[in-house]
Amino acid sequence: MTQSVHAETHGFQTEVKQLLSLMAHSLYSNKEVFLRELISNASDAADKLRFKALSDASLFENDGQLRVRLVVDKENRTLTISDNGIGMTRDQVIEHLGTIAKSGTAEFFKNLSGDQGRDSQLIGQFGVGFYSAFIVADKVTVVSRAAGTAPEQGVQWESEGEGSFTVADVTKEGRGTDVILHLRAEEEEFLDDWRLRAVVAKYSDHISVPVEMFKEGTPDREEDGETVVGTPGEWEQVNRATALWTRNPKEIKDEEYQEFYKHVAHDFEDPLLWGHNRVEGAQEYTSLLYVPARAPFDLYNREQKHGLKLYVQRVFIMDDAEQFMPTYLRFVKGVLDSNDLPLNVSREILQDNKVTVSLRKACSKRVLTMLAKLAKDDAEKYAKFWSEFGNVLKEGPAEDYANREEIAKLLRFASTAGEGEAQTVSLEDYVGRMKEGQQKIYYITADSFAAAKNSPHLEIFRKKGVEVLLMWERVDEWLMSHLTEFDGKQLVSVTRGELDLGDLEDEASKQAQEEAEKANAGLVERVKTSLGEAVKEVRVTHRLTDSPSCIVTDNHGMSTQMIKLMRAAGQPVPEQKYILELNPDHALVKKLDTIEDEALFGEWVTLLHEQAQLAEQGGLNDPASFVSRINRLLLQA
């Protein structure tokens, strides 16, 4: 290898400098992962070359035996991870090794807390890849040449992991990439042959590309008066190099599944659960699907790529094949290996492919089955899953109508039957506890747990001992607009329309309600006249027992939470008028009926309306007027 004069110095992207500094402190306790990351990158480079060579065999350059080699130089204290994969051009080296081309980067750094344990998990999720080399090296040299380019088009990248790196043109005979680690004095353990073999066996046994180390030969020697011929030195494969998903699941240990997950997902934590499935028949495919233990920091970033590693007949095709997993399952990682897709498949071909549609359905069903089994067998573990991914799963009924019932069974909610805000109640739990005569599943959506739990709309349900599901996440209103029934029972918002308790109300209660409506007809009309266009309707309530008033959305109107959701998304929202319901048994409403002064009557009516708005919406358009009105009425009391 010879170096040319075309050398340049570049500054690292700010985020790279931050990441390098963080790794030195947060990942040092698990420093051997650098080798896993670098071998994983080398394996990916081999996979990409194998795929590109399907359409251009000349890229192999008469060397189709893809491999990764570890080369130790004890004298110079260097460890080299060398591959003969796809390689990189000068521009690619600058792009990939000098910047983090990843959406959500700023959000990632914002989430770092300074807590070493938590930060190491976040960094692991982010995928440090190449930069992990600086955990053990004080200088890193990368020499690369892209497959299909001339030897003179090689490039050398070098950095000490500080603020800058240099790039120079070099001549490199073989294609691929050499990552040369100049190890720190205290890291000489990674120059030991057996230490390296142990790390490879631990982390890289499952990758499909052979990892090789040089085995020294032995000289001729005399033994029992005879000459024993020595053996020449040779490259020896030190990993199994069999794609994990192609093996019999019964022969694979949990530790192997866990390490393969870390290779696929570039995560430092073990997965929460996984499923390995081989299907033969009309379609032939193998899937190995993982659910992570922790949500990635960019889970809600729609620009971030998600999806499975796609292989066709064990040949790598692409990363992040999102066509095989719906967006509500975008947290799922893993591998899909199909025998039915063409080797020259592209993302465009996948979009409208019948095989793709069938595989997507099968993979979705598989994940939902895995989650259902987890929920049944290990409630504590499922609760952990729900806390990490529950809000994403709630997107499911809107996206996946065919699996709506299965998704609904996986949903968890807080309810009035519990004390805290832990979301542990399933719809099946709720149905199993329904009171005799109850025909509907009742729920409420609000801005917070406290707002939901203390809503005046719940008063009649508490009085009758009827459980209500409590929802306060932003996605809940969207969920409930697409999940209208479960197990043949309608899901009903307690803040919408006329309250129909069905058989939960006896004839005496219904008659009392009718009499209250007749007795207060004059007051209702007077209140409606006073409020005018501010409300859609005024009526006597039978959902309140302690509060004087509440506002209700009519059956066809847009709920408060849906309005907030649309406004947050920048969508235009039509003007919404609510129904005001009055509790005729409350002292304030009774007082209204005795006020003859129309101006004073109007003040009290407006106050009751504003109180109801505040309880339902969490705010008012004109809070200053509300405060002034309270002060005036207090002075008159």
From Swiss-Prot:
Chain residue ranges for the region called A: 1-347
Start and end residues of each stretch annotated as B: 348-564
C, as annotated region: 565-637
Any one Pfam family match given in the protein's UniProt record, by short name: HATPase_c_3
UniProt KW Nucleotide-binding keyword: yes
Keyword annotations from UniProtKB, A to Z: ATP-binding, Chaperone, Cytoplasm, Nucleotide-binding, Stress response
Location relative to the cell: Cytoplasm
CC per GO annotation: cytoplasm
GO MF terms held by the record: ATP binding; ATP hydrolysis activity; ATP-dependent protein folding chaperone; unfolded protein binding
Recorded family membership: Belongs to the heat shock protein 90 family.
Self-association and partners: Homodimer.
Primary role: Molecular chaperone. Has ATPase activity.
Protein's name according to its UniProt entry: Chaperone protein HtpG
Primary gene name: htpG
